[in-house]
C-alpha cells in the first residue's frame, strides 16, 4: 500500500533493497490474502513479495510518464522505455533509475545508444529546447510549474515560493499515488 495515499500499489525494486525500503513502518506477509486486514492510516503497512525478475527481463518495457506535460518533439514513441545502463547498480542505489538525457552525460549516452529521445520541445522559433530555460525556470509546457525556478536559490531574496519546485513536484507525485518514497 502507498504510505501516503493508502491505495494498493505494485512496486518493482532491487531484491537486496526490499528490507531497507520496507523496514520502518512495513511488515512482510506471506500471501495476498493477509493484506485484506489492512486499514488506511494504520501505523504498519503490510506487503507481499509476489516474485522476482532479472533487470534484463524488463528491457524494452514501456512505462507511463509521471508528469505528462510534454512529449519529446522527436520520436516521442521511443520515450519512456526501460533501457540498460552499466552505471546503474544496486550497490549505489535501487538498481532502477530515471534517466534525463537532456541533463546528464551518462544519461545522454545510454539514451542515445538505445534510441531514446531527449526531452526537448520546440520553442516559438522552432528550435529544440529543454523544459528548463537558460535562467533555470520551467518552460510554459510545464503546467502549474511554468515560470518557476527549478531551485529556490535562483530567486531574489524574499521572492521565493514557500515550497520550492522540487518539493511541489514531490507533493504532486505523492498525491497522485506515483511515489513510494521521497528522499
Range-by-range predicted roles:
Residues 1-183:
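Non-cofactor substrate-recognition interfaces
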Amino acid at each position: 500500500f502507498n504510505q501516503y495515499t493508502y491505495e494498493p500499489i505494485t512496486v518493482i525494486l532491487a531484491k537486496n533493497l526490499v528490507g531497507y525500503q520496507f523496514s520502518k513502518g512495513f511488515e512482510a506477509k506471506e500471501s495476498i490474502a493477509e493484506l485484506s486486514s489492512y486499514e488506511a492510516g494504520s501505523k504498519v503497512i503490510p506487503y507481499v513479495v509476489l516474485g522476482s525478475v532479472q533487470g534484463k527481463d524488463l528491457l524494452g518495457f514501456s512505462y507511463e510518464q509521471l508528469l505528462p506535460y510534454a512529449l519529446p518533439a522527436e520520436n516521442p514513441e521511443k520515450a519512456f522505455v526501460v533501457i540498460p545502463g552499466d552505471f546503474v547498480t544496486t550497490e549505489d542505489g535501487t538498481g532502477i533509475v530515471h534517466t534525463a538525457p537532456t541533463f546528464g552525460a551518462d544519461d545522454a549516452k545510454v539514451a542515445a545508444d538505445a534510441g531514446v529521445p531527449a526531452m526537448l520541445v520546440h520553442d516559438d522559433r522552432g528550435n529544440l529546447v529543454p523544459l528548463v530555460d537558460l535562467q533555470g525556470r520551467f518552460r510554459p509546457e510545464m503546467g502549474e510549474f511554468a515560470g518557476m525556478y527549478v531551485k529556490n536559490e535562483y530567486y531574489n531574496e524574499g521572492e521565493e515560493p514557500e515550497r520550492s519546485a522540487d518539493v511541489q513536484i514531490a507533493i504532486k507525485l505523492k498525491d497522485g499515488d506515483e511515489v513510494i518514497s521521497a528522499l
